[in-house]
UniProtKB/Swiss-Prot annotation:
Disulfide bonds: none annotated. It is an enzyme of class 4 (lyase). One of its GO terms (biological process) is heme biosynthetic process. CDD domains: Ferrochelatase_C, Ferrochelatase_N. Pathway: Porphyrin-containing compound metabolism; protoheme biosynthesis; protoheme from protoporphyrin-IX: step 1/1. Catalyzes the ferrous insertion into protoporphyrin IX. The lineage of its organism: Bacteria, Pseudomonadati, Pseudomonadota, Betaproteobacteria, Nitrosomonadales. It comes from Nitrosomonas europaea (strain ATCC 19718 / CIP 103999 / KCTC 2705 / NBRC 14298). This is Ferrochelatase. Its main location: cytoplasm. The keyword NADP does not apply.
Amino acid sequence: MTRMLPEPAYRHGSVGKIGVLMINLGTPDAPTAKALRAYLKQFLSEPRIVEFPRWLWWFILNGIILNVRPAKSAKKYEQIWTSEGSPLRVHTARQTALVAALLEQQADSSLVVEYAMIIGNPSIAEKLQQMKVQGCDRILVLPLFPQYAASSTGCVLDGVFSELRKMRNIPDIRTVRHYHDDPGYIAALAQNVRDYWEKHGQPDKLIISFHGVPRKTLEMGDPYHCECQKTGRLLAEALELADDRYQICFQSRFGFAQWLGPYTAEILAELGKQKTGRVDVVCPGFVSDCLETLEEIALEGKAIFTEAGGGEFHYIPSLNEHPLWIEAIGNIIQTHLTGWADRRLSEEAAERSRKRALALGARE
């Protein structure tokens, strides 16, 4: 039996607020082996992230991976860590603050806008409880993954609904499934690339790199591959690129199984062997810069390309706090909030309800 968390006493006349919870993957608390061990244990224990027999995976994870990878991963994080902390957390916090300010200007009612992480801090559980304490009775969940995948957006929804099981008074919940072809998102991606090219010139080839997933997930019905392809195509069309000027590929392969291809590392190596003069890489699936962009692409990818004989290598930063991206998030949120009562009407209705309840003998 699920043990439900304590709830405050119900108060007649209380006015519920609307909350928006923006959720990203997560990050370790520090670039240390100890912090990485805790992070990787939680991350690699997610059944949607690693689809493997649980009993066998437990031995592999605890007997091998957690004794080897934390120290190696810590060294990678050390290379990208900032004075403010993890880039992913820093950018996600900034995005949240900017979106909150934008919505405050646009909306008739005050919104509570927070962010959480699937893995690490701040946790989904912590933020949902915090929003309930703040009086949110309607919460929109916005995964910061434009392309749906069971291992990303699916994990977000698992995390949210597992916490709802612990609540007696469950808030109204809406979720955003994906926005891989949202016009505002595509426009922000394209303008972000144009901004970079205006300062640094254009490449011979643009690599559009997405995080990979095992190929079997496509065969089992996951739409991720198709949504990545559509995002990449729409971005290339917005930039008016000929087919031979760009390549869509997938990075971050883990383990020995076949993943979605072509693999970014192999494409970079081949372009290097061809003595390509300049390659730029953009990662549309990562809306905030993180380990996979700043270390895997900007550092490792550059080394692969140049050591194979390539010329210039440029990594185009993620959307991060780009104004058009903040505007796009705001529009996506407003679209999904359609129909929820504004605060002024809620206050009027709540006051009438309170008076009726008191007349019937309610204490509060």
